UniProtKB/Swiss-Prot annotation:
Homotetramer. The keyword Nucleotidyltransferase applies. It comes from Photobacterium profundum (strain SS9). Pathway: Glycan biosynthesis; glycogen biosynthesis. Disulfide bonds: none annotated. This is Glucose-1-phosphate adenylyltransferase. One of its GO terms (biological process) is glycogen biosynthetic process. Keywords: ATP-binding, Carbohydrate metabolism, Glycogen biosynthesis, Glycogen metabolism, Nucleotide-binding, Nucleotidyltransferase, Transferase. It comes from the Bacteria. Coiled coil: none annotated. It catalyses: alpha-D-glucose 1-phosphate + ATP + H(+) = ADP-alpha-D-glucose + diphosphate. Alpha-D-glucose 1-phosphate binds at residues 96, 161, 176-177, 194. GO terms for molecular function: ATP binding; glucose-1-phosphate adenylyltransferase activity. InterPro entries: ADP-Glc_PPase (IPR011831), ADP_Glu_pyroP_CS (IPR005836), GlgC_bac (IPR023049), GlmU/GlgC-like_hexapep (IPR056818), NTP_transferase_dom (IPR005835), Nucleotide-diphossugar_trans (IPR029044), Trimer_LpxA-like_sf (IPR011004).
Length: 405
């Protein structure tokens, strides 16, 4: 597959995920105890054996660089690379103006790789996709551009590009983030929306980006400018994500946009559901990341409190002593002392929680210390005085906070 180049857009600021993105770019936000959001996009390429990948970064990218250096460094393998590319500012002293501009400013890297096809994917969604199957569809249709898509409730579709297709899968309509999205014919409750994943013929991509860059009135965005210009020509096709088969998986079509605190929290709760729609345990589709050299988690009773853990994920290096933890995910090196109760919470790691605490429906970022006796998540009005609380009542403790000291 030497003719395929992956371009992962990883420059998202993630303002709706604050305070988790106050000190890191959105793709570097931890997820699922052991991972970062970027890992899922990278694994989709690696598991498809596409190993020429550029990761385009922009805002607050240092933690992303460190993670990729430790977990995704394949430099030295002939003709294979996973390279982060910082904003080059080749077109002047400015950030990327849009998704298309981000690729345009890095056309020199595309030319250097000499691909036949360019796969442009986002990096802040939770899903599994065998990109090779989408590429095969693209080739079979002799498309110039293929867009992956899925069904979305009509009430949520306004946040996405809404697509219309004919019986052959050819795109015949597209509107980016419409106020009144069109439903799927025969399915009035749902719309067909773009996942923001594209496969281009290399020559088509370069031509369209050059033309778009010359337009002063363009927003230089794939959804707003490139796709609306291309689809009327009849060479843009739509790949149905639900037809993508992952070996070893019984569920198909799971895709979560974790761009808000509520969605991020809910995606973690999905991992803990009885019949989890997204599995971290499929040996036929391994999820690579950087695993620090840590001992197994230690879980034991204290002198006056028995440990009680149910429906949880506990990451390596954690030390749980006499605590009661339910329906929660604990990242690397989480230390919880006796008589503390934690439920429906996500702890991102390197966190110390003292004795006799009560924590419910919270997201606790890295390097947080919580003093003994602290109560979080039981009194919304009090929580709002001291912490960030989402509209849905999820308490978020920012990175490095010292609570109760």
């Amino acid at each position: 597959m030497g003719g395929v180049l992956g371009m992962i857009l990883a420059g998202g600021e993630g303002s709706r995920l604050r305070p988790l993105t106050d000190s890191r770019t959105k793709p570097a936000v931890p997820f699922g105890g052991s991972y970062r959001l970027i890992d899922f996009a990278l694994n989709n390429f690696v598991n498809a054996d596409f190993l020429k990948i550029y990761v385009l970064t922009q805002f607050k990218s240092q933690s992303l660089y460190v993670h990729m250096k430790k977990g995704w460094n394949i430099t030295g393998i002939t003709d294979r690379f996973i390279d982060p590319i910082p904003a080059q500012m080749r077109m002047g002293k400015r950030w990327y103006d849009g998704t298309a501009d981000a690729i345009y400013q890095n056309l020199s890297f595309i030319e250097l790789a000499e691909p036949e096809h360019v796969c442009i994917f986002g990096s802040d969604h939770i899903y599994k996709m065998d990109i090779k199957q989408m590429l095969n569809f693209h080739k079979e249709k002799e498309a110039e551009l293929t867009v992956s898509a899925l069904r979305m409730p009509l009430s949520e579709a306004s946040a996405f590009g809404v697509i219309e297709v004919d019986e052959n899968g050819c795109m015949v309509g597209f509107e980016e983030k419409p106020t009144n999205p069109k439903s799927i014919p025969g399915d009035p409750e749902n719309a067909l929306v773009s996942m923001g994943n594209y496969i281009f013929n290399k020559d088509t991509l370069c031509t369209e980006l050059e033309e778009d860059a010359a337009k002063e009135d363009s927003s230089h965005d794939f959804g707003k400018d490139i796709i609306p210009k291309l689809f009327p020509l009849g060479k843009v096709y739509v790949y149905d994500f639900t037809t993508n088969i992952i070996p070893g998986e019984k569920n198909t079509g799971y895709w979560r946009d974790v761009g808000t605190i509520e969605a991020y929290w809910q995606a973690h709760m999905d991992l803990l559901s009885e019949d989890a729609p997204f599995s971290l345990y499929n040996r036929q589709w391994q999820l690579h990341t950087h695993y620090p050299p840590l001992p197994p988690a230690t879980i034991l009773d204290s002198e006056n409190s028995k440990v009680d853990i149910n429906n949880c994920m506990i990451s390596a290096g954690s030390y749980i002593r006499g605590a009661q933890i339910h329906k929660s995910i604990l990242g690397f090196r989480t230390n919880v002392d006796h008589n503390t109760m934690i439920s429906e919470s996500v702890i991102l790691g390197d966190v110390k929680i003292g004795a006799n605490c009560s924590i419910r429906k919270a997201i606790i970022d890295k390097n947080v210390h919580i003093a003994p006796g602290t109560v979080i998540g039981e009194n919304p009005e009090e929580d709002k005085k001291n912490y960030h609380v989402s509209d849905e009542g999820i308490v978020v403790i920012p990175k490095g906070a010292k609570i109760g000291y």
